Amino acid sequence: MTITQVKIKKLENFSGSLPEYATEHSAGMDLIAANEQPITIKAAAIQLIPTGIAIALPDSFEAQIRPRSGLAVKHGITVANSPGTIDADYRGEIKVILINLGKEDFIIEKGMRIAQMIIAKYERILWEESISLMETMRGSGGFGSTSV
């Protein structure tokens, strides 16, 4: 496994600990809420939650913001634009767009683990326009065509 060093900046509203892997084989690191006051996410509503950190990713890397399964299954709280993408050239505060799909209001307290961040390498492509594409068994079938 390759370890890549990434610069991280604690902002004024930062509190708690830096994102870290919970276990040796964890893919994601928990992001911590850095709100000064509790934030209520009403049922069916969306809120932008600060984390108090900014990062400088190397070229060809992105950060993906994903839901925490416990918040989703227990409270219906998930990341609205999952996965959210943080590009390598973004230097602002990482914020998480949470949506409450539950039936009750949910309160985000300072220091709460609200999402996971996964750092991933990506490839850039160059389009090659073509009048035809190689045939496959699946063809153009989609949206449940391989099974329900």
Swiss-Prot record:
User: Pathway it acts in?
Assistant: Pyrimidine metabolism; dUMP biosynthesis; dUMP from dCTP (dUTP route): step 2/2
Q: What is this protein called?
A: Deoxyuridine 5'-triphosphate nucleotidohydrolase
The cofactor required is: Mg(2+)
Q: Which domain of life is it from?
A: Bacteria
Please report which protein family the annotation says this sequence is part of.
Belongs to the dUTPase family.
Which reaction is recorded as catalysed by this protein? dUTP + H2O = dUMP + diphosphate + H(+)
> Any idea what job this protein has?
This enzyme is involved in nucleotide metabolism: it produces dUMP, the immediate precursor of thymidine nucleotides and it decreases the intracellular concentration of dUTP so that uracil cannot be incorporated into DNA.
Report the coiled-coil segments: none
Name the Enzyme Commission number(s) assigned to this protein: 3.6.1.23
Q: Name one GO biological process term.
A: dUTP catabolic process
Q: What class of enzyme is it?
A: hydrolase
- Cite the entry's keywords alphabetically: Hydrolase, Magnesium, Metal-binding, Nucleotide metabolism
* Keyword Iron found: no
Q: Which residues bind substrate?
A: R68, S69, G70, N81, T85, I86, D87, K95
User: Could you tell me one molecular function GO term of this UniProt entry?
Assistant: dUTP diphosphatase activity
Cross-referenced Gene3D superfamilies: 2.70.40.10
Keyword Hydrolase attached? yes
Span of the secretion signal? none
**Pfam families, per this entry?**
dUTPase
